């Protein structure tokens, strides 16, 4: 028996990476929690007009920054696309003649079409390299022209949510199983996986998804490497026993 298929699949991302942008937009934002009895006394009715309370309580809703605009920014590439992969699979099952044994094999290949990654647009390239034996990593000096940030009035990390198409994975599985031989069923399988990507986006926010990436010099290198979620070699098995009784009842005990 042969089986297989191919297709393009689209998914979602953690939506916090979208909400990072409006909440870190570099404009004045204010969270107001009334605790003073004098302020609470003024809030005596519901008002649908969103501009009413900021105008009625100007001391609690500042309209101009006291020093400078907030330094936190999170950006989204105007051409950003939701994650999309091309995936193909092929499988074969072969029943060994005159035995209950079935041999099976499967191959799955996936290729990123629109992978998701974060890029720090406020990162200056390094100006120097270490000169130790076997260690030539980049580093940032202490001179005025060797600043880590392009714009020092902003935070160290200004993440840009964008796409990459460099990731892929290949998984192959072989196995053998028997089904319901005097109530017994069993199987054993081996899987090999090679999976590489630019990033696994290991963070709950845009900045942590960038800064938590493993890298030699800095996460902006965007070098393809082994996926942190890949399991290269895996062996699995199962064993179960089914007993029928009372004409219409059955109990199965399984071990995986």
What are these regions (language model features)?
Residues 1-160:
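Solvent-exposed loop/turn elements at secondary-structure boundaries
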Residues 104-248, 254-256:
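Gram-negative outer-membrane beta-barrel transporters
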